[in-house]
Amino acid sequence: LAHRRMMQPPFHHGNLDSYVAIMHNLVNEHTKDWQDKKSIELAPEMMALTLEIVSRCLFGLDSHQYTKAIAESMEVAIDRIERTMLPGLERFDKSGIKYFKEFEVASDRLVEIAEAIISKRIESKEVKNDDLLGILLQMKGEISVDHIRDEVLTLILSGHETTANVMSWAFSYLSKNPKVRKQLEDEADAASWIKENRTPTYQELEDSSPVASAILQETMRLAPPVWIAPRIATEDCTIDGIKIPKGAHVLVSQYVTHRNARFFPEPEKWDPSRWADANFEKSLPRGSYFPFGGGSRKCLGEYFAIAEARLILLMVAKNF
């Protein structure tokens, strides 16, 4: 919990307006040449855009020089990280087997990038506490440089790949649902900040995006940003007659739970309209919908990610 408190300040609601301004500029900048192309490869575009947003907002950094290296290393690293839940797999990490060797190379590369980001910030002598990296660097006497590096790596890994995947799935679902796509386009056309070509506040973005929000909620139901949450039982317990001993590895799957027909009628159908009633989510039992996790380990960047995704959806719907 102490670690969580240390990481909370950059994600407070009071910072969201400044983040939305940065996001707005970066989405404009990143998508300006899309009009000249017949088609684009959306997944890598979303990866690059969300990396730019996280880098600029949380690290005060232009990420262009690292985009390709991070993308290549992330693909290898995430595959291995997702297999962490397989007991005993870590014994093979230093085995020299090709798969594990590739992970070691990718991991080392990401560490080098994180260290370069930190060094560049220190050399710039701009160690202000107006973003996450600045806050961490001002605590250098209390936490080690290795700790700071690990936090930067965690945010690079968790702060852009998850959002990029959700966006790719959202646009995929929209491409197959012209009625919902038209609703989103109408919402973008009606947004005053888009009409006036200006940056919205966080509240203005939230108020102008009920359709975009429903699209995101339904997309995260069927294609959650994290599909499984590994946990370790802290005490002996019994669930539905099954005894779970203290120390047991327990896997809780968003992907499976979000498809439970008891909570979501026609669970395999992508239907944003189910979220149109504001009371629908409130009526769901605790733990039936948790795209950002839950409890004391719930994702700190939830509102940051939702603002980013709403903005991308509306701006792309308006311009393309």
Residue spans for each PLM region:
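Cytochrome P450 proximal C-terminal region
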Residues: 27, 75-76, 189-193, 235, ...
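Active-site rim elements
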Residues: 39, 97-104, 202-205, 296-302
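Cytochrome P450 heme-thiolate "Cys pocket" and heme-binding signature region
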Residues: 9, 153, 158, 200-203, ...
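Conserved cytochrome P450 K-helix/beta-meander segment immediately N-terminal to the heme-binding cysteine loop
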Residues: 134, 252-281
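Cytochrome P450 I-helix active-site segment
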Residues: 20, 24, 72-77, 126-135, ...
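Cytochrome P450 catalytic-core helices
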Residues: 50, 162-187, 302-319
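Cytochrome P450 heme-thiolate monooxygenase catalytic core
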Residues: 2, 15-166, 183, 188, ...
